[in-house]
């Protein structure tokens, strides 16, 4: 049994590289000679397909796994010979070079066609996509972007407002770098969800919600062929069922939860390997500070002291996660090693008494999967110990991701407590974009604002001194914690089990890059 740990060592330096063509990790898919004929890969995805619009999506699995199969990007995630995360030049470009800290030149591959008769992929599509991203829900990933200067239909230059070393990885390799068809998108009113008006990639897709996504060959694709002609991704929401499906030989790869990871380390399934994508996840319990029951900061701080994050790591994650003290993940500048509050039930009781609160009843909402429900159940017991009665309310992924967004209904007004986990990129600026003032009612479900926080966010993007960036991000997490609206929980590893006959390609954020997955 092999364990493939993907290192992030040297990431930031590598991400600022001036040219991508010289690195062996940057090949497009695989060569035609290596392409498998008629082979099918069977994988497991979980959760509902929410949206394939790169500027208006939840992100993560299965949205990104799908998006990377059917839309152009200038770069994807790759790894160098040491395992460090680097930009990987895609089949959609002949060349991409960072000429200087604020200019990235690229040349598109000619002859790549959009489906549904929308013509050739051109720099007009790239400009439209990037300009649109800069004003979308995901615009934080494009804060450094100023404009795209078109030279001709294939050549253009990305111009940044100021130097931002990880732009290729943070902004271009993730969903924010996905390119959509200008004419097709404008034709459907400027936005779409799960039915893309035009795609351009080696695969076509068909899907049935919560059942499957099937990827089949795109007959109009003139680029290099991926290793697997067909991919079937089946939806299995229950993690134990997914592990059983793998053990029964029904699927070739699946993400596994920490308890399964712990078990497979001791007793692996036959002919299997484990791949660890990274620990770029941060989980916390959020509190809606506008809710009448939680408006008093003493109540929120009491809840901070009531929750035992170490017990959650051991009970829900088998000790395989790292206890969290903020939103910056392990290995990154700005990672905290302690918080200003501690697990202290006596302090929690004293704060509740000081606030004159008794017989408090709250609801904890969580995604309906094993480790989140276990986490919420442990929190429920912690709160019970200080006199707070909590009810755990598991949610399917669709309703869960809608509940704090004002545009999706009125549920945000009812939110009290929730267990939340976001994925990050390999730079500390990324997680903070969701908590600035303008994200209230979108992704800042705790509903607080801070002028200092907003100013520091902008400062962190343009600051190049690592020591200064470290201080900025430490202070920003302190501001978040001081609202009383956050209980930091864990940073968990993203782990997959796969057949020894399959060489899985994983993004550092934990999704599968299926177009690069091939027979081992």
Give the ranges of each region predicted by the language model.
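N-terminal secretory signal peptides and thylakoid transit peptides that target proteins
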Residues: 1-19
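Detector for C-terminal structural segments
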Residues: 17-29, 212, 217, 306-335, ...
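Alpha-helical secondary-structure segments
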Residues: 42, 122-129, 153-159, 201-202, ...
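N-terminal lobe/hinge region of extracytoplasmic solute-binding protein
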Residues: 44-100, 198-199
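Gly/Pro-rich hinge or "lid" segments in bacterial periplasmic/extracellular proteins
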Residues: 75-82, 164, 172-226, 230, ...
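Aromatic- and charge-enriched surface segment that lines or borders ligand/interaction sites
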Residues: 94-138, 157, 242-245, 293
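Ligand-site clamp/hinge motif
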Residues: 132, 218-264, 389
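Surface-exposed binding/hinge segments that line
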Residues: 140-185
